[in-house]
Amino acid sequence: SEYNPTYSSTYNRVIERGNVICGTNDEFPGFSQEIWNNEDGDRWEGFDVDICRAVAAAMFGDADAIEFTIVNGKTRFEFLIDGTIDVLSATTTFTFTRNVAKKLEFMPTTYYDGQGFIVRKTLGVSSAKQMQGARICFSSTGTGAKNIADYMELHGINYIPVAVKPTEKTKNVYKRGDCDMYGTDRSGLASNRLSFDDPDRHMILPEIISKEPLGPVVKYGDQKWSDVVRWT
């Protein structure tokens, strides 16, 4: 029989509006960043951005039938659930809790990552295991806090946690010198390092302390819309 899913509020809203609203990070080179050039003016570029453009192309045959809304660790799920955005493409980790408790539907993983650490080379360390007593900063809303706690406990390392609220960028707290080491997905560390004024003075340590399957997210229960995003 013909496939005919139930009414999808997001799908119908997108059709009526004529474009897709994508929630993504800002200042994340390689994944999502607004760049100005003489030919196009301001234009969003990056891996997560291209995923959203592909969804727009699947819906309308036009990859530019898209709007981008900047989200942070706190607003990304709120905006998705309340309909401010249609799809979230912002280096978001697929977890059991987010899937079940927050009523979110994760699409196929588009990037397999793992959490790591970045430090200033002046510290003279080559491993996270040498960071006894260090101040370690991480986003208060991500998976980082538990990953770091588990890793440090496993290796008997005492540290000072510095949880950064979503209203402030963790990389800026690190750049200010308010922590000795910064922990997040290694793709994020590499991207953030490139944005520093002095990238050569910072190094990503070799440890990978978690597995982070990243991918786009839609609201749970919107079957027709989730099919569009999943099969794009």
Locate the predicted segments by residue.
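Sec-exported extracytoplasmic/periplasmic mature domains
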Residues: I15-E16, A56-D64, I81-I85, T122, ...
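Acidic, polar ligand-binding/catalytic clefts
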Residues: R53, A57, G61-Q130, R186-S210
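Extracellular/periplasmic bilobed ligand-binding domains
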Residues: K165-F196, D200, P216
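Bilobed "Venus flytrap"/periplasmic-binding protein-like clamshell domains
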Residues: I21-G30, G41-M59, T93-T95, Y112-K169
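Extended ligand-binding regions for polar small-molecule ligands
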Residues: S1-P5, Y11, V49-R53, A57-A58, ...
